[in-house]
Amino acid sequence: MDLKAQLKAAVEQAAHQMGMPVDAAIQETPANKPGDYGTPAAFQMAKAAGGNPAQIAAQLAQTVVLPAGIRRVEATGPFLNFFLDAGAFVRGVVERPFELPKREGKVVIEHTSVNPNKELHVGHLRNVVLGDSMARILRAAGHTVEVQNYIDDTGRQAAESLFATQHYGRVWDGVQKYDQWLGEGYVQLNADPQKPELESGIMEIMHKLEAGELRPLVEQTVKAQLQTCFRLGARYDLLNWESDVVGSGFLAQAMNILEGSRYTSRPTEGKYAGAFIMDVSEFMPGLEEPNVVLVRSGGTAMYAAKDIGYQFWKFGLFEGMKFKPFMQDPEGNTIWTSAPDGQPDDERRFGHAQEVINVIDSRQDHPQTVVRSALGVAGEQEKEERSIHLSYAFVTLEGQTISGRKGIAVSADDAMDEAQKRALSVLQGINPDLAAREDAAEIARRIGLGAIRFAMLKAEPTRKIDFRWEQALALNGDTAPYVQYAAVRAANILKKAEEAGYATDGTGADWDALPDIDLVLAKQIAKLPEVAAQAARIHSPHVVAQYALDLATSFNAWYNAKTKQGKPATNVLQSEEGLREARLALIVRLRKAFEDTLDLIGIEIPAAM
C-alpha cells in the first residue's frame, strides 16, 4: 500500500473512532500551501454530522495515527495538512517496487483492423499504438488481455485491390513489400476514369472472396501488414475474419437474443413495415429517430446487426467460430486465426470477456454506441457498461489530410524508415562519436519509433494530431526523445558511480541527510502506480505519456538545481558520503520508473544519447 493509501486509511480510521465515518480524499497540497498532502475530510464530516469543520479538523488531527513517512499533521482551518519525513519517504519509494492495485477479469481489445487491400499509412499508427498501449497497461493492472485484429476479407476494398492486380496484369516481383505493391494497384484503379465500367469484374472478385476462394491472397496481405505492426512493437493473439464471423451464424444468434426484448419489434405498417427494428431511446437519449433498423424488410441485415453479433460473441453470449494457428510473432508466440477448417473452442479460450474495448476512429461513434446499446436491449446491463469504444480523432501529416484511396499518404513503413533516418541525423549533429558507434542504428531505431509512438499518444485520443517530424524528434518539449534523454542521463550517473566503486543499492545511505529537493523528485516517482491505474480506469494511455514528461521534467529540474551561491545542488557523485549513497539509490529507482513508464506505452530506452 502506498503512502497516500495509508494516509487515507488512517484518516478514515480516526473518523470512525470519532463516530463520523468518511470516504477521505487525499490530495497533494498546492505549491503555495503548507504540507505535502492534505484532506478536506473535516468538511464532509461536518456536513454529515453537523458541527464546526475547523473544530472537527483539530480533533481529527489529534486522533489520527500517522503512518511511517509522515512527520507531523496540522489542522489549518477545516483542512488537515500532512508533512512528510523526507528521509523515510524517499527510502520507502526506493524500496517499494512499482505495483498496480490488481484488477481481475479478461479484457478483449480489438485494434488495427485495417482493410487487407494495401499497406498501413501513418494515420493507422494511432490506432495500433493506442490499442497496443492499452493492452500493456491493462496487463500491468492484472487483467488477462486478449488482443484481436478484425480482418474484413469480404469488403469492397480487398476486392478492388485484387481486381486491379488482375485487370492491369500486375505481377509482384517478390522484393517489394507485398501490401505496398498491392496498394499501388488499388490507387491506380481508383484514379482510372474507366472504373465505373469495371463494376461487374469487381463484383465477381467480391463473390469469390465471400466464397473463400481468394483467402490465401488476403492472408498474404495480412502477414505483410502484421510485419509493419510488429516493427512498431504491437502484438496480437487472434485474427478474426469477416467471412468467418458471417459464416458462424453470429447474426442469427444475436437477433434471436434480441427478439425476446421489449425494445425490439417487427412493425406491420409504416416506414418500418416488415423490418426488424430496435428502439434505443432509453440507451441513447436525445435521438431524433430512436429506432435502429437491424434487418430490412427484404431480409438483408444492416452492418450494425453484424457488429452487434460480433460484440455479443466477444462477451461470450454464444459460441460458433473455429480456430487454428496462423503464424508466430517475433518472440515466437502463436497468433491464432478464425478458420472454417479450424477446431471448436471447447476450452473457451477466445472471447468470453468481462470487458471489451474497440479501438475505432471517431467516425464510428454512433454505430459503436448502437452496438453498446444492443447489450442493454438484450438485458446485459453490466456488459453494456463494460463495452468500451476507444474513439480517436484523425491524424494529419505535416498539415496534409491522409487519403489511402487517392494515394495521399505516407506508408507506415516509410514513416518508420524516415523516423530512424532523421534520428540518426540528429545524433550525428549532437554527438558524431555517438553516431559512429556499432549500435548507432539500434539507438536511432529506438529514438525514431519512440518518437512516432509518443506523438500518437501524448494527446487525448479525441484530439486531432498533426504529425510533424521536427517536433516529434526534438530533444526538448513534449517528445519521446526528451524523456529518453532523461532516462539515459540517469543511467549515465549510475554508470559513473559503479566505475567509482560507490554503492547504488542503498548500502551506507544516510536517508536523514536528504533535503526537500530530493523529496520532490521522490514524490514524482511515487505517482506512477496511481497514474497507471488512472489510465486503466479511463481507457486512455495519454495520461501515462504525460506522466513520462512530468517525470523527465522533475528529474531535469533536480539535476540542474543550484544552491543560493549558484553551485550545483544535486551533484550526486560529489555529495557527502551517506547522502551520495541515498541519492544513488534514488536514481536507481528513478531509472526503473522511466523503464516501467515507457514500457507501458511501448517505448524503448536507447543505450546512449
Curated annotation (Swiss-Prot):
PROSITE patterns cross-referenced by the UniProt entry: AA_TRNA_LIGASE_I
Location of this chain's protein in the cell: Cytoplasm
GO cellular component: cytoplasm
Pfam families per the UniProt record, alphabetical: Arg_tRNA_synt_N, DALR_1, tRNA-synt_1d
First-listed, main subcellular location of the protein, grouped into a coarse class: cytoplasm
Catalytic activity: tRNA(Arg) + L-arginine + ATP = L-arginyl-tRNA(Arg) + AMP + diphosphate
Superkingdom, taxonomy of origin: Bacteria
GO MF entries: arginine-tRNA ligase activity; ATP binding
Keywords linked to the UniProt accession: Aminoacyl-tRNA synthetase, ATP-binding, Cytoplasm, Ligase, Nucleotide-binding, Protein biosynthesis
EC number assigned by the record: 6.1.1.19
Biological process, per Gene Ontology: arginyl-tRNA aminoacylation
Record-linked InterPro entries: aa-tRNA-synth_I_CS, Arg-tRNA-ligase, Arg-tRNA-synth_N, Arg-tRNA-synth_N_sf, ArgRS_core, DALR_anticod-bd, Rossmann-like_a/b/a_fold, tRNAsynth_Ia_anticodon-bd
Motif 'HIGH' region mapped to chain: 114-124
UniProt subunit comment: Monomer.
Family: Belongs to the class-I aminoacyl-tRNA synthetase family.
NCBIfam families: PRK01611.3-4 (NF002447)
HAMAP family: Arg_tRNA_synth (MF_00123)
Protein name as annotated: Arginine--tRNA ligase
Organism: Deinococcus radiodurans (strain ATCC 13939 / DSM 20539 / JCM 16871 / CCUG 27074 / LMG 4051 / NBRC 15346 / NCIMB 9279 / VKM B-1422 / R1)
